[in-house]
Design a protein with these regions (language model features):
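Catalytic-core regions built around general acid/base machinery
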Residues: 107-118
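N-terminal helical cap/lid subdomain that shapes the substrate entry/recognition surface
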Residues: 2-10, 14-105
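Glycine-centered short loops/turns at secondary-structure junctions
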Residues: 118-119, 196
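Generic recognition of short, well-ordered alpha-helical interface segments
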Residues: 66-70, 103, 110, 162, ...
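Asp-based, Mg2+/Mn2+-dependent phosphohydrolase catalytic module
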Residues: 1-6, 19, 85, 113, ...
Length: 227
């Protein structure tokens, strides 16, 4: 059966999360009088944030805890004394300011323009519902997509199969009509394959631990070879 629907993850796949996140911290930390070299901060923060997002996907922490604890643990690890009030303020400002930085991965516009002529495009994201649409609108990619599905709207998070079952029902598609593009092997690729949906792993960092049965690309424009 011919592919009719292309699902994309948003953060780390189209929207350059790490670059935009770094720019946001460069803005909000000095404004809160937190004096630290941004590279030193990010070196500690990024793996802590990654671990908390994994816990969040696994329903082990709440959204509120994620927003606070990833900053609290980073400051503690760096031995920087920051008041709880300031941490809560920073966590809210981060969410507010993040969508205003809009770097996309190379080839995003070109590949979306190419695919839109042939397929119906959709987003499936675990990102916070209140900012995902803002990110897409401010970066100029919102109008490429017919459907935006957030895990918060479903009530569970990727890699829960219910997210993909909901997505198929939402767009009135069969699994064999669809393909998923994303950066996270567990949350995007393996679960899609387990649902009978084809999948392509976006691997811009050239990670080498990719299972042999998974198709992987390093640049979004490489999708033209498959779609």
């Amino acid at each position: 059966m011919k592919i009719q629907h292309v699902f994309f993850d948003l953060d780390h796949t189209l929207w350059d999360f790490e670059k935009n996140s770094a720019l946001t911290f460069q803005e909000i930390l000095p404004a809160a009088n937190v004096s630290i070299d941004i590279d030193s901060f990010l070196k500690v923060y990024i793996p802590i944030n990654f671990s908390y997002w994994k816990k969040y996907r696994e329903e082990k922490v709440t959204k509120k805890d994620l927003k606070y604890l990833r900053l609290k643990e980073t400051f503690d690890a760096l031995k920087i004394s920051v008041k709880d009030e300031t941490i809560h303020q920073l966590s809210n400002e981060y969410i507010d300011k993040l969508p205003h930085h809009n770097h996309l991965f190379d080839g995003t516009f070109e590949i979306l323009e190419y695919l839109q002529k042939k397929y119906q495009l959709h987003i499936i994201t675990n990102g916070f519902e209140e900012i995902q649409t803002k990110k897409m609108k401010k970066s100029g990619i919102y109008d490429f997509f017919e459907t935006i599905i957030t895990s918060e709207s479903v009530g569970v998070k990727k890699p829960n199969k219910k997210v993909f079952e909901y997505a198929l029902e939402k767009v009135n598609a069969n699994a064999f009509d669809c393909i998923m593009i994303g950066d996270n092997l567990e949350a995007d690729i393996e679960v899609a394959l387990n649902c009978g949906i084809k999948a392509i792993h976006f691997n811009p960092e050239h990670a080498t631990h990719i299972p042999k049965n998974i198709t992987s690309i390093h640049n979004l424009l490489d999708l033209k070879e498959y779609l």
